[in-house]
């Protein structure tokens, strides 16, 4: 299967370096065309030369559209370079590392078998219909017909579901990457939620994914490498060997799974579509 991987990056250059290595080393089920779009050049965040050999197309934007529009800018510019032969496009944050591509193959097959579904990613909010954009698989033909899917500022996850609704298109949840957040009333601390203000999990052992912002980890990227070894059940990063990986994965699954027992708004109130002010 022909799949384009559209990776966007601003300043997470080290994350990108390791992500590209992981893709080339462990994603073997499909034919991948890797596009990297960067908007950090004006601030000195250049793509290192040793990463270039893992990139099929590098798009460097001279200017950054800013905090509200930067993410949209990267996706819209990168989408211009998706090959005609690509059946699916995976949009990926530079700091989202996935061991192996079984999860991609699974949801590409499901999308192919579901005619009206064009997007697959995790459910983002409990209150609103919203879809994750850090790891999302999309039918490429839909992007070509509807480039506005990436034209957003605030609440990109809500924009996606609103846009799909308005174009009479469906989505599939990637349940292996759920739940993303703990309930908002968990305000002190929770295992595997390094930044309680965000209230977000950064490890997903079912999909063999880690997506940490390394500034939230005490030991930075070395700790992230250790988490990656745990979820992948490998010593992919030999410098960050972890013992008792199975026990650590059990703890991840337990604490993530436990949140399904916590009272949530969706238990007593239906999800709604968020009205986004332009």
Identify the meaning behind each predicted range:
Residues 44-86:
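Active-site-proximal specificity loops/subdomain of glycosyltransferases
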Residues 31-41, 60-63:
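Short beta-strand/loop segment that forms part of the nucleotide-sugar
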Residues 97-166:
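Conserved catalytic core of nucleotide-sugar-dependent glycosyltransferases
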Residues 158-278:
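C-terminal catalytic/acceptor-binding lobe
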Residues 12-26:
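Short, well-formed alpha-helical segments that are part of the catalytic scaffolds
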Residues 14-16, 41-47:
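Short, charged/polar "capping" segments at the starts of alpha-helices
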Residues 86-97:
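Short beta-strand-to-loop acidic/aromatic patch adjacent to the donor-nucleotide binding site
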Residues 3-12:
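A conserved hydrophobic helix/loop-capping motif in glycosyltransferases and polysaccharide synthases
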